[in-house]
């Protein structure tokens, strides 16, 4: 008992030291997410050649850290047309020098124009792999919970590998079992939809959109899928162990236009923490 009691003051001191450290870490994370939100809010997405059509940017769908890669802090946002996903933007602060990177990926069948102020920073002509039918999937169920179970079963049929830029070593990405976004747009024939993320740690590297679609009222809904890359590395996607899509290393592919392709990665500056406030603008 004496030994236990003599340990208690040391434990109290240790816990007392841990609390300010945890509070400081929370404050840093709050500052960083505020900065990432500010950066996202500076972007406006329109239809190509149609500045009057502005898509809505939502709150962060996912907050992530990728200690297996470079990102120390990041957030993923989604542009919407009504409830439908249009495009994705991830903003991250990366080690070792707090470089700020912006990744954009289109899920839209036609052209887009992403602007920061008056400058066009990304103008994809098309999305990734879009609206591919899943003819062998069972008809969409009537209930929400049953359809969610179906979407998860469909998503588990996909495997995504990520290839190291120098060694080509493969890493299989992990699928988050809960969609990061779920929606319906029945006036556009989409009964239900879920956006699934394939991740390293919890950093999305590939997105899979699974949708239950119905062409006519009253008919049984079928299923379709779309894919959007969220990594500059080479990636290969398989469905039931059969390769269906691959993308080359973004920085080694001379055939892909950096500004008009469906995916873009850009360094936008450096994050500098401001004491007692939000991070500075990228320098």
Locate each region found by the language model.
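Polybasic, proline/glycine-rich intrinsically disordered low-complexity segments
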Residues: 19-52, 65, 92-186, 206-283
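Exposed beta-strand-loop-beta-strand "reactive/processing" segments of non-cytosolic proteins
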Residues: 56-92, 179-206, 210
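Bacterial Sec-dependent signal peptides at the C-terminal "C-region" and cleavage site
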Residues: 3-24
């Amino acid at each position: 008992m004496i030994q236990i009691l003599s340990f208690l003051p040391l434990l109290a001191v240790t816990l007392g030291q841990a609390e300010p450290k945890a509070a400081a870490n929370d404050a840093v994370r709050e500052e960083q997410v505020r900065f990432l939100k500010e950066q996202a809010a500076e972007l406006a997405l329109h239809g190509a050649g149609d500045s009057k059509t502005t898509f809505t940017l939502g709150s962060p769908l996912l907050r992530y850290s990728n200690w297996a890669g470079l990102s120390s802090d990041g957030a993923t946002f989604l542009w919407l047309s009504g409830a439908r996903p249009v495009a994705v933007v991830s903003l991250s602060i990366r080690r070792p020098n707090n470089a700020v990177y912006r990744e954009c990926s289109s899920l839209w069948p036609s052209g887009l124009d992403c602007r920061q102020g008056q400058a066009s920073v990304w103008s994809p002509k098309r999305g990734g792999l879009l609206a591919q039918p899943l003819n062998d999937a069972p008809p969409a169920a009537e209930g929400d919970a049953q359809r969610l179970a179906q979407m998860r079963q469909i998503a588990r049929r996909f495997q995504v590998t990520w290839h190291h830029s120098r060694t080509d070593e493969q890493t299989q990405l992990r699928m988050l079992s809960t969609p990061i976004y779920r929606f319906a747009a029945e006036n556009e024939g989409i009964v239900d939809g879920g956006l699934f993320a394939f991740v390293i740690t919890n950093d999305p590297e590939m997105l899979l959109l699974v949708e239950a679609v119905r062409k006519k009222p009253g008919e049984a809904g079928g299923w379709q899928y779309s894919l959007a890359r969220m990594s500059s590395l080479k990636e290969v996607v398989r469905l039931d162990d059969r390769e269906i899509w691959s993308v080359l290393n973004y920085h080694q592919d001379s055939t892909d236009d950096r500004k008009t392709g469906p995916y873009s990665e850009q360094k936008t500056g450096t994050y500098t923490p401001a004491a007692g406030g939000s991070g500075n603008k990228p320098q």
